[in-house]
């Protein structure tokens, strides 16, 4: 079994916006713009995490929107060269722990049927 890449999971800040916006453009056909990310960072009902590599570059990120007692994972993206290292799993585990601690009724993530890596 291949050794997993070491990352630190931390809350996303304004310092991460450029790298996250670039990651959006790389990973999605309809990416969120930098301005959309700024707006979501300012949303009190949203939380965003980044996975930082050993050089403090963004290897991946994920977003969560909480509405009443419901959790909606809005985004999960990992740099192509960093995939298959458990990064998305680590990001999602933080949200799962949050959902359990705050007794959310559910936590959802929509994935395209063609996204076999996510399924």
Predicted features along the sequence, with ranges:
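Acetyl-CoA-dependent GNAT
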Residues: 2-4, 8-83, 89-98, 102
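Conserved hydrophobic beta-strand within the GNAT/NAT acetyltransferase core sheet
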Residues: 73, 106-111
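Conserved beta-strand-loop-alpha-helix junction that forms the acyl-donor binding cleft
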Residues: 109-119
């Amino acid at each position: 079994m291949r050794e997993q890449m070491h990352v630190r999971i931390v809350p996303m800040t304004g310092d991460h916006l450029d790298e996250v916006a670039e990651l959006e453009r790389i990973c999605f056909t309809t990416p969120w713009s930098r301005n959309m990310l700024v707006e979501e960072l300012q949303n009190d009902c949203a939380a965003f995490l980044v996975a930082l590599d050993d050089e403090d570059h963004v290897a991946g990120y994920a977003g969560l929107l909480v509405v009443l007692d419901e959790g909606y994972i809005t985004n999960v993206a990992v740099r192509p060269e960093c995939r298959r290292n458990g990064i998305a799993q680590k990001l999602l585990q933080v949200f799962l722990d949050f959902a359990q601690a705050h007794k959310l009724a559910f936590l959802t993530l929509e994935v395209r049927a063609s996204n076999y890596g996510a399924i």
